[in-house]
């Protein structure tokens, strides 16, 4: 048996070596420098599993802002630092609008949806989603009113704890429900079984997507399939998809061509009732688009709001300055409105610094849609490219104290809010986050509303410095599960 195993491993290594030698079909390609790959494993031995972004930043110190890394057999180009990322994502060519094939997302979405599709299907889904969100009032008063309604419901939950410790994850209920209200036309009671099930499933999916097993599956799909590493997340995704399909079908009888729509799902159904020769808005892709919106719209904003609260508990001096500004501008009785942002420069600076500091999504890969000139190199069509957002948000040439939580990064000498070109938590270019405007609106109104009403403190016996700001292992850099106290302000 041992001899057979050694023979198998030897053949596997030989196969990997032969594949690596035959991998580059484009003799004209001019690849950036990078570490020499090992057979089969490539450069995986140089990357820390829990901190791949930091490992890639360390490699850039040796090989420069544009370098090549081998993820298994996959030759991938990494962009680090603001200048390299900006040139690639916001340049005139926009050649990096595609996504590379990622094994688990190919199985989940089969080329559909918004975030991991490419080409005509992606363009149609994205353009539709942008129009639908605009028509539903994103960034304007109709959605702002929904957010403030949800703020009241969230405050009711926090009041029930009477200043005692509450789970940090509770803060994610409000952003999730705002997303559901836009998608399905109604908010859910926090005890609604559908709401509870969806939040639980989304949490499990996000943890599984960030697991070592799924990362191994994405690099070696054949090995992952052999070990069934992808099965748990596919089962959970199918449970989410079943709920979404039920919600979508419940709306179908109520949607007629030409009628005003009150939700994203209504708009999807109505679009599918019209001329759709490519089937871009047939049921399967409608569910895929809704799935993408559910997963992205709940996890990212929910995690950011939790981080904001956690960092206020860890930095009581910053929290105090935010509350002093809120009291001075709003007073004790008036809830914040969208138009208050300009009058609250320190609050805005703190929110921006939260997003910079946490680097929620360190890197989501792009792919060259054609042979592409990048940083003096020629990359063949289909090359995966990682714009490393962590390296932008921590770029020492752009930020005075990149490793520290410092709201001053977004303030001038007179205390006025300053927009920073290197602030790219939502990425840039044609693949910029489709929900950026909604996320910004939610975060401002919820964060300002919570700090207007509560002091966010560590639990009794826990010092501010003891609050854990180490990210949990998941698809995003979400905070670890812990508790805070929301003490009503006088």
Swiss-Prot record:
Major localisation: endoplasmic reticulum
Domain of life: Eukaryota
Reactions catalysed, as given in the entry: all-trans-retinoate + reduced [NADPH--hemoprotein reductase] + O2 = all-trans-4-hydroxyretinoate + oxidized [NADPH--hemoprotein reductase] + H2O + H(+); 1-(9Z-octadecenoyl)-sn-glycero-3-phosphocholine + reduced [NADPH--hemoprotein reductase] + O2 = 1-[8-hydroxy-(9Z)-octadecenoyl]-sn-glycero-3-phosphocholine + oxidized [NADPH--hemoprotein reductase] + H2O + H(+); 1-(9Z-octadecenoyl)-sn-glycero-3-phosphocholine + reduced [NADPH--hemoprotein reductase] + O2 = 1-[11-hydroxy-(9Z)-octadecenoyl]-sn-glycero-3-phosphocholine + oxidized [NADPH--hemoprotein reductase] + H2O + H(+); 1-(9Z-octadecenoyl)-sn-glycero-3-phosphocholine + reduced [NADPH--hemoprotein reductase] + O2 = 1-[(9S,10R)-epoxy-octadecanoyl]-sn-glycero-3-phosphocholine + oxidized [NADPH--hemoprotein reductase] + H2O + H(+)
Cofactor entry: heme
Protein name: Cytochrome P450 2W1
SUPFAM superfamilies named among the record's database cross-references: Cytochrome P450
This protein's record includes keyword Oxidoreductase: yes
Residues bearing attached sugar chains per UniProt: 177
Tissues/organs with expression: Very low levels are detected in fetal and adult tissues. Highly expressed in several tumor samples, in particular colon and adrenal tumors.
GO biological process, one term: retinoic acid catabolic process
Compartment(s) where it occurs, according to its Swiss-Prot or TrEMBL record: Endoplasmic reticulum lumen; Cell membrane; Microsome membrane
Positions that bind heme: 433
GO molecular function: all-trans retinal binding; all-trans-retinol binding; heme binding; iron ion binding; monooxygenase activity; oxidoreductase activity, acting on paired donors, with incorporation or reduction of molecular oxygen, reduced flavin or flavoprotein as one donor, and incorporation of one atom of oxygen; retinoic acid 4-hydroxylase activity; retinoic acid binding
EC number: 1.14.14.-
Function noted in UniProt: A cytochrome P450 monooxygenase that may play a role in retinoid and phospholipid metabolism. Catalyzes the hydroxylation of saturated carbon hydrogen bonds. Hydroxylates all trans-retinoic acid (atRA) to 4-hydroxyretinoate and may regulate atRA clearance. Other retinoids such as all-trans retinol and all-trans retinal are potential endogenous substrates. Catalyzes both epoxidation of double bonds and hydroxylation of carbon hydrogen bonds of the fatty acyl chain of 1-acylphospholipids/2-lysophospholipids.
Alphabetized UniProt keyword annotations: Cell membrane, Endoplasmic reticulum, Glycoprotein, Heme, Iron, Lipid metabolism, Membrane, Metal-binding, Microsome, Monooxygenase, Oxidoreductase, Signal
Keyword Glycoprotein found: yes
Entry's family note: Belongs to the cytochrome P450 family.
Signal peptide per UniProt: 1-22
InterPro entries assigned to the protein according to its UniProt record, in alphabetical order: Cyt_P450 (IPR001128), Cyt_P450_CS (IPR017972), Cyt_P450_E_grp-I (IPR002401), Cyt_P450_sf (IPR036396), Cytochrome_P450_fam2 (IPR050182)
Pfam family, one: p450
GO cellular component: cell surface; cytoplasm; endoplasmic reticulum lumen; endoplasmic reticulum membrane; intracellular membrane-bounded organelle; plasma membrane
């Amino acid at each position: 048996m041992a001899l057979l195993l050694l023979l198998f491993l030897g053949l596997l290594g030989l196969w990997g070596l032969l594949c690596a030698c035959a991998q580059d079909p484009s003799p004209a390609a001019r690849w950036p420098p990078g570490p020499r790959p090992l057979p089969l494993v490539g450069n995986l031995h140089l990357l820390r599993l829990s901190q791949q972004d930091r490992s890639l930043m360390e490699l850039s110190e040796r090989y420069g802002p544009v370098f090549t890394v081998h993820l298994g057999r996959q030759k991938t180009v990494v962009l680090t630092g603001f200048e390299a990322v900006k040139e690639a994502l916001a340049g005139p060519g926009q050649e990096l609008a595609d996504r590379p094939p990622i094994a688990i997302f190919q199985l989940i979405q089969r080329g559909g949806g918004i975030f991991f599709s490419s080409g005509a299907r992606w363009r149609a889904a994205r353009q539709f989603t942008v129009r639908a969100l605009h028509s539903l009032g994103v960034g304007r008063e109709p959605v702002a009113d929904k957010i403030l309604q949800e703020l009241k419901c969230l405050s009711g939950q926090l009041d029930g704890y009477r200043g005692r410790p509450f789970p940090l994850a509770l803060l994610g209920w409000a952003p999730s429900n705002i997303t559901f209200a836009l998608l399905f036309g109604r908010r859910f009671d926090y005890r609604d079984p559908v709401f509870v099930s969806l939040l639980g499933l989304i949490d499990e999916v996000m943890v599984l997507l960030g697991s070592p097993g799924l990362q191994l599956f994405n690099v070696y799909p054949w090995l992952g399939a052999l070990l069934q590493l992808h099965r748990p997340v596919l089962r959970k995704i199918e449970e989410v998809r079943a709920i979404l399909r039920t919600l979508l079908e419940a709306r179908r009888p109520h949607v007629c061509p030409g009628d005003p729509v009150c939700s994203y799902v209504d708009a999807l159904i109505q679009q599918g009732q019209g001329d759709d020769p490519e089937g871009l808005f047939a049921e399967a892709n409608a569910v895929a688009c809704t799935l993408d919106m559910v997963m992205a719209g709940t996890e990212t904003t929910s995690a950011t709001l939790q981080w904001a609260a956690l960092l206020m508990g860890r930095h009581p001096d910053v929290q105090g300055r935010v509350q002093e500004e809120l009291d001075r501008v709003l007073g004790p009785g008036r809830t914040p409105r969208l138009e208050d942002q300009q009058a609250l420069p320190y609050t805005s600076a703190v929110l921006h610094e939260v997003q910079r500091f946490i680097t929620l999504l360190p890197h989501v890969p792009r792919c060259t849609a054609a042979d592409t000139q990048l940083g003096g190199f020629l990359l063949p069509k289909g090359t995966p490219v990682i714009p490393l957002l962590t390296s932008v948000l921590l770029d020492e040439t752009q930020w005075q104290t990149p490793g520290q939580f410092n709201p001053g990064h977004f303030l001038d000498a007179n205390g006025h809010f300053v927009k920073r070109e290197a602030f790219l938590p939502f990425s840039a270019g044609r693949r910029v986050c489709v929900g950026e405007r909604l996320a910004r609106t939610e975060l401002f109104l919820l964060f300002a509303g919570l700090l207007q009403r509560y002091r966010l403190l560590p639990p009794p016996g826990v010092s501010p410095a003891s609050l854990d700001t180490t990210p949990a292992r998941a698809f995003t850099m979400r905070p670890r599960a812990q508790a805070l106290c929301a003490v009503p302000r006088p």
